[in-house]
Amino acid sequence: MQEITTLEQFNEIIAGDQKVIVKFFAGWCPDCTRMDMFIDPIIEEYSQYVWYSANRDNFPELAEKYQVMGIPSLLVFQNGEKLAHLHSANAKSPGQ
């Protein structure tokens, strides 16, 4: 999973025709570390998406714009629009 490091890169990635998933995380977040322990099989299962990560603390304006109120959060984008949003607090199992 490639980490997004600039706002320009983020905007370019989400603008494409292909659906992408961006995982918002923070280095201090214990739930983010737990998610990393089981995310690889999920990425493999959903390989039709291109996966990226973005440190929420580096992009507070994106967190506000896309309502990333908790982390980790998975957001699906296509053609510059947010299609779906899963916050870890709403997931009952790793499969979700």
Which residues are covered by each model-predicted region?
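Thiol-based oxidoreductase modules, predominantly thioredoxin-like and allied folds used
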Residues: 3-6, 24, 36, 40-61
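CheY-like receiver
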Residues: 12-13, 62
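Residue-level signal for alpha-helix termini/capping positions
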Residues: 14-15, 44
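Short active-site neighborhood of thiol/selenol oxidoreductases, capturing the structured segment around
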Residues: 15-27
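Proline-centered helix-kink/hinge sites
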Residues: 19, 37, 41, 72-75
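Short, thiol/selenol-centered motifs that function as redox-active sites or metal-ligating centers
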Residues: 28-35
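A short glycine-leucine-enriched loop at secondary-structure breakpoints
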Residues: 65-69
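Non-catalytic, surface beta->alpha helical segment in thiol-disulfide oxidoreductase systems
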Residues: 70, 75-96
